[in-house]
Amino acid sequence: MSNNSFDDKSIDKLKAYVYALFDPLEDRPFYIGKGRGNRVFQHVEGAILEDKESNKYETIREIRSRNSNNRVKHTIVRHGMSDEVAFEVESALIDLANSTGANLTNEVTGHNSIEIGIMNADEIIQKYNAQPLNELLHSVVIININKKYKAIKDGALKNNTKYPG
């Protein structure tokens, strides 16, 4: 048995799973994903074999460069799921991690995170009680800010996107 792959019996029992990659020195996740089979181990392999630049690969390369004993820690958070359930669990964990200031290297936030992802009570009320905009009375510019941006203090988003004139 190897620490960079699962045996066939384990793969059969895992089904779809959600995993986290940890920096062993910081003991906090830097990546959360959904997979089957040996997917959890493929990121380290990709960082070694590919020239692709990404925050995830850079983090893995940095961990590996410290010394041979520093390895990415692979943690299965939940397993034995269908793909559909695993996507929901993955999205919920990414949302929670991002809302607590974790420095995840995920390039996307997960399935349906914009529509049904993490929201406070006021945001839920606003979402489901918003009145439809039937007509525009003035010229407008619409800026779509998705949840990929880092959380900022109240008012800062408005101040940074309003017209200066």
Predicted features, each with a name:
Residues 155-165:
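Structured alpha/beta reader/binder surfaces that contact nucleic acids or chromatin modification marks
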Residues 2-150:
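Structure-specific nucleic-acid interaction/processing domains
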